[in-house]
Amino acid sequence: MKKKHLYLLIATLTVAAVLPIIILVCFSSANEPQRPVTIIYRNTEYAYKEFLTGCVLSCLKTLDEPPADDESEGINAVAVALDCSLRYLHSAGKSFDSGYPYVEYMDEKESIQHFGAETGIYRKYAEHSAEYAISLDLTVQEGTAFLPVCRISSGITISPEDSGNPFVKKLYCEKDKSAEYYHSTCQLTADGIAEIMLTAYPSLIIPPDESKWISDIRRDADGNALRLNVCGIDMSCEEFRRLFDIRSPAFEMSYTQRLYSFDIRGDGCNSGMSVYSALMLSKRGYSCREILNEFYAL
């Protein structure tokens, strides 16, 4: 074999061996997992436990009714996953409120507006689960990892290959379809799309054909959007959903008379743990650790 061919073969084998490690590193940190004392989120500083509590509350906001004691193991599992993700974001030097991956937080004012008179019940479970997660201090492969949580899946979660996160599992969460907030609709006006895109991309030149502003949607085998083109910008579905407040990557889209309409299934990233299914497992007697193992490759 000629030397140059031998070198090429060695280089190819080296890349093939290293690539899975590169993907793993993108969603994990093997350093000693440090928990920050405070977190800056949207220019406000929060004590860590308070912030974790607010993240748990955000995950509970689509429940049909306040949680009960037989759902506490599921809520604990949610808090543990969020705590691990927060420590990963901190150790990786990533922002908590921008880019991807990221977390969602519900402050005290928003929780009162959403839960009303039942706020105290929700907060009791959220605070207890935050304390549990901090005391457990879960590590993944001797480090931290981003463990995504969605409130309600569309029935089929995104695979680790398509999500790029080796710690998630592809699951069929059929019971999520019975959740009250499983289905939703959303509309975006052409003017609204232009305003949002110009705010995010000030130098963007908006194309003239409004009917093609959102196009080239690339999906996985189950129909979940992975990437798409918006006004000439190729972006991930996560960025698109964050910009336009689309609840789930499982959506169908139509355009008519300067209006984009979305028919959406599920609520959240549609990858990793479904809160709705986690609470169902808790009711069936699953422990926190058993629930985590259902959704993540730990």
Which residue stretches match the model-derived regions?
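Conserved, single-site charged/polar hotspot
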Residues: 1-298
